[in-house]
């Protein structure tokens, strides 16, 4: 059984797209999927509210949600994906600035890991 993980960003539109894709991929693979919400102690109230909305969306779509603290998003994602035995990790790479900037995506992609990474852009789907 395959395990799909998705890192939920602060951007609501991107988070929704990633949830839809993670749920669909897990269903096609007859597997489970989990959503990771990376927080830190200084998370302002509006960002915390967004994180909760994204988590609720993930749960409504059949995902399990992990809220985790971590200042280094890439390292935290790598550790969580390994711990949860993720086979495929989905990350967003939109043009807009958000917490999972290209630097984070590049660091995860280049890291030594035991899972595949799928990077989803915010452009139109082909």
Label each PLM-derived region with a short phrase.
Residues 109-126:
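Short, flexible loop segments at boundaries between secondary-structure elements
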Residues 26, 58, 81, 110-112:
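A generic structural signal for well-ordered alpha-helical segments
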Residues 92-107:
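Glycine-rich, Arg-bearing micro-motifs that act as flexible, cationic patches
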Residues 61-88, 125-126:
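Structural beta-alpha unit
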Residues 1-66:
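Small/aliphatic-rich secondary-structure junction motif
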Residues 10, 82, 94-96:
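Short glycine-rich anion-binding loops that position phosphate/pyrophosphate groups of nucleotides
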Residues 37, 88, 93-94, 121:
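Short secondary-structure boundary segments
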């Amino acid at each position: 059984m395959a395990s799909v993980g998705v890192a939920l960003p602060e951007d609501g539109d991107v988070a929704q797209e990633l949830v839809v894709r993670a749920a669909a991929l897990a269903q096609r693979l007859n597997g489970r999927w989990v959503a990771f919400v990376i927080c830190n102690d200084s998370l302002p109230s509006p960002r915390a509210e967004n994180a909760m909305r994204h988590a609720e969306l993930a749960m409504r779509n059949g995902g399990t949600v992990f809220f985790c603290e971590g200042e280094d998003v890439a390292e935290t994602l790598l550790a969580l994906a390994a711990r949860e035995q993720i086979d495929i990790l989905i990350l967003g790479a939109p043009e807009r600035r958000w917490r999972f900037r290209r630097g984070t995506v590049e660091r995860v992609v280049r890291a030594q890991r035991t899972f595949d990474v799928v990077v989803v852009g915010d452009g139109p789907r082909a």
